[in-house]
Structures are given as structure tokens and as C-alpha cells.
């Protein structure tokens, strides 16, 4: 899951989006780079630059988001910082001590060493970038996770990027819509409003939105329902065209696929992000004798 939470520092609050490091969650890390202001690239001092590290660097560079390197586990005896700096330089990440402009902080999650310096570096970078957002007007945000709760119904974790989201606001989220019935912070405490950079869980939606869907708040219920209906119709049209295209390709390959066994799958997970990762991993599996047909995936 993407973890979204805030940390109080001497220089104000910092919002963190914590994405999984496993290879299956590539799309989740890519989205994280798209909606964040600064990427904190954590590299284990005893492991060095891993394939997922290289991928995270590519996401950050592609999104043109500044990187702060945090070398973790420096308390370990086999920590090799010089090796990491060399590997990073080969990936176009030059730290300040190597003549580049990328901040590099040595930290230990076990002892707490370097954590204060890391928070200070993030605050300094945000000042240099002059990161600001309007706390007025309708809320605009991005869905970082969504799920279906037995008691609360469809819920979505949203990072507010500008404006103010209030309880009872009407919202349009992708093809879903609704009126905010309740809002909760990362500690599951109910709140009445959320401003820029605040991660918030909302209830009251018509369905579970897709991860990365944009949220827009308004006081016009009719307009929200109208746009949501148009978006749903458009999505169904796209899905139908995709199925027709797949059917045509399958017919073209019918001779070679005639003896191939097809396993139909329905993927249901706790949150949208996990479902997406499972589908991505399954599609990467290639087999000459058995094929997969994912009929449905979601929460």
C-alpha cells in the first residue's frame, strides 16, 4: 500500500508518500514520483543500488523531481557508502561531495542517526524550490489508494494539492462522484476539512475510484453527477473497443492458440494498488501451454 502521512518538524509539517519497494509495484512508484515535490531515494548501505533503485531514479528524472539520497543502515559493519556513491554516479545522480547538486544524507533507522539532518535537508530543498499552494477555493487532489470497507463503503485516500476540502462537499473523482460523508486523517481521527499537502481518507463516494484519479470539489451536485455519467460511458466505450481489439488478435492467432489452455481469473484485493500490482505480475508470466484471461480486477 502507499502510506501517506505527515511529520511535524521544527520547520513545519512534511507530508510523506511511502511506496512499496517490491518490483511488482512499479506503477505505484511511478505515480508517487508524479505527485510529489521531492523524491527521497533510500538506498541500503549494505545492499547498494538495486534494480528498484534504478527504476525509482528513472521515475524521478522523468518527472523532473529533485532527488535527496538517504543512505540507510550506516550502523552496519558492512556499510559501503563509497560504493553506493559510485553506483549512483553511473545513473546520473551526482551527490554534492562528488561535485554534483544532489543532497546525500547518511542515516540509520535503528539508531536515529541523520534523521534530523534529513528532515532539515527536505525543508531546505522546499524553500529553494519555493513550494507553495493555494489554501483557497475548491479542492483539487489525487487518489493515492482506494478500497471497499464493509462498514463505510467505498473509501479513497486522497492527497489534497490545492484548495480546501470540507465535509459535505460534493466531489468528482474520476468516474465516481458523491458527497463527503466523513473524512479521516492518517491516525483515523475524523476531521472536518483538509488543505494542501494533507493526506485524507474520504467516504461517501458512488464507487471505488482508480488510483491516480483526480478529485475536484464543488457545490454543484447536478454537474458532478452529469460529468461522472459521461466519464463512465466513455470508459465503457474504451473497454469495449479494447475487448474487440483483443478478440481480433486472438482470432488471428487462433491456429497456434487452439491447443492452449486458458485460465480465467478474477482478481480481488484489499486495495486498488495491490490489485494493479498482481495483474501486472500475472501479465508478465509467459507460457506456451497456458494463458491467462483476467475477467475482472479490483477491490
Regions flagged by a language model, labelled:
Residues 1-38, 45, 58-61, 146, ...:
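Switch I (G2) and immediately adjacent beta-strands of P-loop GTPase domains
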Residues 12, 25, 50, 90-100, ...:
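Active-site phosphate-binding and catalytic loops of NTP-dependent enzymes
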Residues 13, 23, 34-54, 61-82, ...:
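Conserved Switch II/interswitch segment of TRAFAC-class P-loop GTPases
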Residues 16-18, 40, 53, 60, ...:
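Residue-level signature of catalytic and energy-coupling elements of molecular machines
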Residues 19-22, 33, 44-48, 65, ...:
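Short, ordered loop/turn segments at secondary-structure junctions
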Residues 50-51, 76-83, 113-117, 180-181, ...:
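Switch/connector loops and helix/strand junctions flanking conserved nucleotide-binding motifs
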Residues 62, 150-299:
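C-terminal effector/interaction modules appended to NTPase cores
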Residues 66, 75-136, 201, 291-298:
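Canonical P-loop GTPase G-domain recognition
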Amino acid at each position: 500500500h502507499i502510506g501517506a502521512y505527515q511529520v511535524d518538524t521544527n520547520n513545519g509539517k512534511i507530508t510523506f508518500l511511502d511506496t512499496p519497494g517490491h518490483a511488482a509495484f512499479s506503477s505505484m512508484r511511478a505515480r508517487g514520483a508524479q505527485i510529489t515535490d521531492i523524491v527521497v531515494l533510500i538506498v541500503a548501505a549494505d545492499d547498494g543500488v538495486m534494480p528498484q533503485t534504478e527504476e525509482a531514479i528513472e521515475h524521478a528524472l522523468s518527472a523532473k523531481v529533485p532527488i535527496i539520497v538517504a543512505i540507510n543502515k550506516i550502523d552496519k559493519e558492512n556499510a559501503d557508502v563509497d560504493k553506493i556513491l559510485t553506483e549512483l554516479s553511473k545513473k546520473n545522480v551526482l551527490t554534492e561531495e562528488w561535485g554534483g547538486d544532489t543532497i546525500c544524507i547518511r542515516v540509520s533507522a535503528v539508531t536515529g542517526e541523520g534523521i534530523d539532518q534529513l528532515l532539515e535537508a527536505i525543508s531546505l530543498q522546499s524553500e529553494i524550490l519555493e513550494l507553495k499552494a493555494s489554501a483557497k477555493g475548491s479542492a483539487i487532489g489525487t487518489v493515492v489508494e482506494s478500497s471497499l470497507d464493509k462498514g463505510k463503503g467505498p473509501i479513497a485516500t486522497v492527497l489534497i494539492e490545492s484548495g480546501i476540502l470540507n465535509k459535505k462537499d460534493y466531489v468528482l473523482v474520476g468516474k465516481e462522484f458523491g458527497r463527503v460523508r466523513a473524512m479521516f486523517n492518517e491516525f483515523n481521527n475524523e476531521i472536518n476539512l483538509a488543505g494542501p499537502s494533507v493526506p485524507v481518507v474520504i467516504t461517501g463516494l458512488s464507487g471505488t475510484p482508480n488510483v491516480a484519479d483526480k478529485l475536484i470539489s464543488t457545490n454543484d451536485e447536478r454537474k458532478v453527477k452529469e460529468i461522472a455519467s459521461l466519464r463512465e460511458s466513455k470508459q465503457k466505450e474504451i473497454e469495449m473497443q479494447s475487448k474487440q481489439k483483443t478478440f481480433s488478435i486472438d482470432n488471428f492467432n487462433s491456429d497456434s492458440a487452439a491447443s492452449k489452455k486458458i485460465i480465467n481469473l478474477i482478481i480481488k484485493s484489499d486495495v486498488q494498488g495491490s490489485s494493479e500490482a498482481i495483474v501486472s505480475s500475472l501479465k508478465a508470466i509467459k507460457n506456451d501451454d497456458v494463458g491467462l484471461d483476467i475477467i475482472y480486477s479490483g477491490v
